[in-house]
Swiss-Prot record:
Residues 15-22 are annotated as: G1. It is found in: Cytoplasm. Belongs to the TRAFAC class translation factor GTPase superfamily. Classic translation factor GTPase family. EF-Tu/EF-1A subfamily. This is Elongation factor 1-alpha. It comes from Ajellomyces capsulatus (strain G186AR / H82 / ATCC MYA-2454 / RMSCC 2432) (Darling's disease fungus). The gene is TEF.
Amino acid sequence: MGKEDKTHINLVVIGHVDSGKSTTTGHLIYKCGGIDSRTIEKFEKEAEELGKKSFKYAWVLDKLKSERERGITIDIALWKFETPKYSVTVIDAPGHRDFIKNMITGTSQADCAILIIAAGTGEFEAGISKDGQTREHALLAFTLGVRQLIVAINKMDTTKWSESRFNEIIKEVSNFIKKVGYNPKAVPFVPISGFEGDNMIEPSPNCTWYKGWNKETASGKSSGKTLLDAIDAIEPPTRPTDKPLRLPLQDVYKISGIGTVPVGRVETGVIKPGMVVTFAPSNVTTEVKSVEMHHQQLQAGYPGDNVGFNVKNVSVKEVRRGNVAGDSKNDPPKGCESFNAQVIVLNHPGQVGAGYAPVLDCHTAHIACKFSELIEKIDRRTGKSVENNPKFIKSGDAAIVKMVPSKPMCVEPFTDYPPLGRFAVRDMRQTVAVGVIKSVIKSDKTAGKVTKAAQKATKK
C-alpha cells in the first residue's frame, strides 16, 4: 500500500498541562513521522547546548509550535506520522494559545482525541480535579462531535510500572469519561512512557502484566498492545462528499487577467468547474469557471481540499471572507435571521444574560451576535432541561440560547453541516463559551444578483 493510498485521519491531543502531551506527540512524530533526520539532529544539538537533552521529543514539538506561533509556515509534514493503515495529522495540541478556538473553527474536525493522563502520584489527581483542564478538553471534544477517544496513561515509569496504579487510574478515568458522554468499553486504555518510548510503538518489556487493550464498538471488537495499535484501530471517518456543497470563504482575491478568485476549504460536497454557485449571505449567484489547488487545475474539489476558484461577473466587493458558497441547485446556503444553539459557558468572570453581544467565530465568519433569549438551562451531559427561561447563566452552565447576528451571517444546524454548526464565543480576548447550533431561521430574501454567466450556464 503506497503512502498516497492511505486514508487520512486527524487527531487532537488533550490533557492537563503537565501530562506529557508534547513529549508523547513529539515521540510519535519523531519515530513514525515526517521529520527528516537532518532536522532532528539540528534540534538535538540545540537541545544539548541548552542542557535540555532529556527534553528531546518535547523540544521537537516546541520548536514546531514556536515557529507556528511566529507565523512561520511550517511544512505540515512535520505534524504528520504514519501508522500501518493511516496517514495521521495532529491538528492541534493544546497549550497552543488559541487551542479552543482552533478546535471549533479549526481547519478540520478531529476524527479521534487522545487523552493523555499522567500516572504520577498527585499528578493524576490534579489533572482530573473539578477545575482541571482535562475535564474541559474532554467535554469540548465530545460536544464538538469527536466521538472516538483513546486514553494514554503516561509517565508509567515514574510509578515503577505499577499494575495496581494503572488499574486504579482506569477505574477513575472510566467514570470520568462516562460523565462526559463517552462509553469506556469503546475506549482503549494504554500504559505508556512518552519519554522512554515504552508501549508507544513496540510493546514494552517493563510491564509484563499488561495483556493489551480491548475496545468494543458498533462495528465490532478490536485489541492491541501499543498506542500506535490503538491509533491504527480508529474507525475510518466518512467524508461528506454526498452532502450539498458548503465552502466557507477564507479570502477573496482579485487576480489580474483572471478576475475574482474566492479561496476556502470544501467542508461538504464537491465543487466543479461549470457549476452554478450561490454565495450566502450576500445572495450572489454565478458560474464557477475553474477550480485549482496548489496552482493545479482540478476537475473537482472534495471535502478537506483548500481550493481557489474563479468566478465570472462578480467583483471583490460582492463576496467576502465569512461568506459561504454552495450549489445553487442543491440546498443553496442562505443568510439567517436568528438561530438556536446549545451554548456552554467555559470561563466568563460574571453572569451572562439576555442582551449579551459578544463576537462569534463560526467557520470563517467573525460576527457579533446577541443572546436575545435564554430559552432553557440544560444538563451538559444528558441535554435534558433543568430550568426554563433562566435569568442568567455562568461558567460551567449549558443553555439553549436564541442568537441574533448583528449583520448577515450564514450558519447551519450542526447535525446537517457540522463545520458550519459549531462556534466559539470570544470576549475579553479569550474563548468564553462554545456553541453547537440546533436550528436556524433562514432569511428568505427575494432573488439576489444572478450574473449573466450563471444565466447562460443554467440554460445549457
